[in-house]
């Protein structure tokens, strides 16, 4: 049954959520004197904790779980098809999104900024991958995006690679990720025994990705979910 938590319990939950660690003395003092549950005290403590270096744990752990960034180190696109991909680019992908998440958090921006932001963070390696000129050095800096297709999370290399196969992009994986992670509306499991897409047209020509996806949308069993994705 629901119950009102104590100030000490509140301090513990707040600290482990924001810092992934135990409360510090200042937070414990507010809990012990019974004022932590007061809205103005709770807000002040939360803002103080978010401004602390220990809040880096929130970026790493929360973004890692919510956006699947913790899976980025295991990404291995096909090296024959993507010979330019390597450890430096993989690490830059992850750091870009972590810095982006951190900026929205510390600047108290709206949640829609995750999808619409006209800025990102790049170093020389990542800028070269994105085709952005005049960026030099390994350090990351904030830039304004000229290319609208790069706006927000859905333009980040980390998210695009996480929602692709090793050999090609995948609108289905990407749509599923959006439904699950951004809209909290996961699609139902696919029906059993769904055949692989026919990647060759009747005249022997390779199908475009749009043509291949039309096969699923034309199948009534698959269409309801694939129209969403």
Feature locations, PLM:
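Short, well-structured beta-strand/strand-turn elements
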Residues: 26, 130-142
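Active/binding-pocket-proximal capping segment
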Residues: 118-121, 133-134, 197, 229
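Extended, non-catalytic substrate-recognition/exosite surfaces adjacent to catalytic cores, especially
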Residues: 82-124, 128, 143, 147-156, ...
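Surface-exposed patches in mature extracellular/periplasmic domains of secreted proteins
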Residues: 58-62, 109-116, 137-139, 178
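Short, well-ordered loop/turn and helix-capping segments at boundaries between secondary-structure elements
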Residues: 16-20, 24, 33, 52, ...
């Amino acid at each position: 049954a629901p119950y009102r938590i104590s100030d000490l319990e509140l301090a513990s939950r707040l600290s482990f959520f924001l810092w992934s660690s135990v409360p510090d003395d200042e937070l414990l003092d507010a809990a012990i004197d019974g004022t932590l549950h007061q809205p103005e005290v709770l807000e002040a403590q939360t803002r103080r904790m978010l401004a602390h270096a220990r809040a880096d744990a929130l970026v790493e752990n929360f973004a890692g779980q919510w956006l699947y960034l913790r899976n980025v180190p295991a990404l291995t696109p096909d090296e024959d098809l993507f010979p330019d991909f390597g450890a430096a680019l993989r690490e830059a992908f992850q750091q870009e999104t972590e810095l982006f998440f951190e900026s929205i958090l510390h600047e108290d921006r709206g949640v829609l900024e995750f999808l619409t932001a006209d800025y990102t963070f790049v170093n020389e390696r990542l800028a070269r991958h994105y085709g952005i000129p005049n960026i030099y050095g390994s350090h990351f800096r904030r830039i304004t995006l000229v290319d609208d297709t790069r706006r927000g999370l859905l333009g980040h290399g980390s998210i695009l690679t996480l929602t692709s196969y090793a050999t090609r992009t995948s609108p289905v994986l990407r749509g599923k990720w959006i439904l699950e992670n951004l809209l909290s509306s996961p699609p139902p499991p696919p029906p059993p025994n769904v055949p692989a897409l026919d990647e060759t047209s009747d005249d022997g020509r390779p199908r475009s990705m749009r043509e291949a996806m039309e096969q699923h949308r034309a199948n009534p069993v698959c269409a309801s979910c694939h129209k969403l994705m």
